[in-house]
Amino acid sequence: MTLDNYNIFNDEYLFNMPLSPLPKVLGSFEAQSVLTLTTPTLTPTTTRNIEDTIGHLLSDTQADRGAGCAGFAVPKVLPNAMGAIEALGMGIPSGVTTIPIQTSYDMSLAQASESEDSNASYNDMQMNEEQDTTDTSSAHTDSTSYQTGHIMAGSVNGGGANNFTNVLAAVNSSRGVASAGSSNANTSNTPARRGGGRRPNRSTNMTPEEEQKRAVRRERNKQAAARCRKRRVDQTNELTEEVEQLEKRGDAMRKEIEALTNSKSELEYLLIAHRSTCQKIRSDMLSVNTCNGLIAPTGLLSAGSNGSGASSHHNHNSNDSSNGTITGMDATLNSTGRSNSPLDLKPSANIESLMLHIKDEPLDSTIDSGSSLDQNGPPPSKRVTLPPMSTMPHMSTLMTPTGASSGSLQTPITSTAPVAFGSAFPVTTNGSSINCITINSISNNNMNSPTLNALNKVPKERPNTLAFQRPMAQMHLTLPNNKAGGPTQIQGVPIQTPSTGTFNFDSLMDGGTGLTPVSGPLVPNSSSTNKHPLELPTPTAEPSKLVSL
């Protein structure tokens, strides 16, 4: 047996039923929990309450209840509803009879089926009333007024325009009467609350101290919630500002990338267009001209090659290549001598013009006392080109001074100097006068090798004689009273140093080293006739200094 047998949802009711929202329709069938305006969506708690309500309405299926065995109380059909149906011109279908009015059954069925839920519904209504007395929120007010039936007030008298609403009001009134009649004896029993929901605002067994603590706790929770909301808002604002800054930075970087890409494209285009010209310039720059081992411009190549003559030799293993080019790191050069050194591209002057600027300096008339006699020390810093051998004499006569009164000094000393040394430095002494050392002037036209490399390749010979000069070249050394002995006066000035005398064998042995001065002038004897010492001048030309031969 279904609900259609009672003709509740037939055509006459469906067409006359107004378009009401679903929460209002469902809220008319239960009194325990309803959908309030504060919870417009279906939650698990409200869904369970709805299921419990529908389950209680449809749970009674006993056969002895007759027409009301489905648990649904048949509403009363009012006369004004039937009149409205006839006025609308909708006839009753042929298979549908008039709806029986079962007033006595409604009361008994409601009392028998709803007696078990009376206590729970009464307690829930009491708690809702307590919340309404303490809370001032509009949600509780709306839910309470909706639950007590204030919304549907006045809809019963609406005539035939709202017939289905009248039916629901009749059902609600019958349930309210049944619950009110059966709940007077069971008010002392307070069962546990069913379902979820908010905790009641006021408790009957709470002391004032506990109420004060609850108020303080609620105030503290409100402040904490406000701080949390403020912190969340601040964090959201900070994140929003950071996102905006990052977006601006990203836009700037994208613009910079576009600018760099454009610059790269332009540079690549310029390189491609310049590549053909760059190869020719590079080949011209890496070709270097040389003249006798020195890098020179192209115009001086022929002049340097002609001036060198036969002394310019082509050497494949040295840097003195005269073919005009050298080979470096690139294949355009022809020699490998400068491969590991950087190229010197400075232009150099002509070799002939360089030789004209060399100044002729005479050889020093005195020999440095710090230099060794056998020329074992470092070479001197000054280098003078030797003249040709044919223009210089091969002999130089070295004679000791002789006097008319000194017969022991009449033996001439003649020595032959080597060709390379004596021809370049002729030394001659006659009588008491000593000529200075002369040096022949060197002419640039007599040079066979105009290059510096050729000058360095001339072989050198070691000298085996010593060029010297008397410190007093124009002075006469005279003996007083024409007696035999060493000179003791120079132009009437007596000499007080012991270096004026000669050292004989006995004085050298007795003196120890020969450098020890002896008292008084020594007169040369017969054994020291041919052993006249050669005095060497010092840089200060002082005769008082002792020099050992």
Swiss-Prot record:
Domain of life of the source: Eukaryota
Residue ranges, annotated region (Disordered): 177-233, 304-346, 363-390, 510-549
Chain segments carrying region Basic motif: 213-232
A Pfam entry, by short name: bZIP_1
Coiled coil: none
Protein localization: Nucleus
Cysteines paired by S-S bonds: none
GO molecular function, one term: DNA binding
GO cellular component terms, semicolon-separated: nucleus
Positions with biased composition (Polar residues): 332-342, 366-375
Residues modified as Phosphoserine: 341
Keyword tags: Activator, DNA-binding, Nucleus, Phosphoprotein, Transcription, Transcription regulation
Compositional bias segments (type: Low complexity): 177-193, 304-324
Record-stated family: Belongs to the bZIP family. Fos subfamily.
PANTHER family listed in its UniProt record: ACTIVATING TRANSCRIPTION FACTOR 3-RELATED, FOS TRANSCRIPTION FACTOR-RELATED
Role according to the record: Developmentally regulated transcription factor AP-1 binds and recognizes the enhancer DNA sequence: 5'-TGA[CG]TCA-3'. May play a role in the function or determination of a particular subset of cells in the developing embryo. It is able to carry out its function either independently of or in conjunction with Jra.
Subunit structure: Homodimer. Heterodimer with Jra. The kay-Jra heterodimer binds more stably to the AP-1 site than either of the two proteins alone.
Protein name: Transcription factor kayak
Record gene name: kay
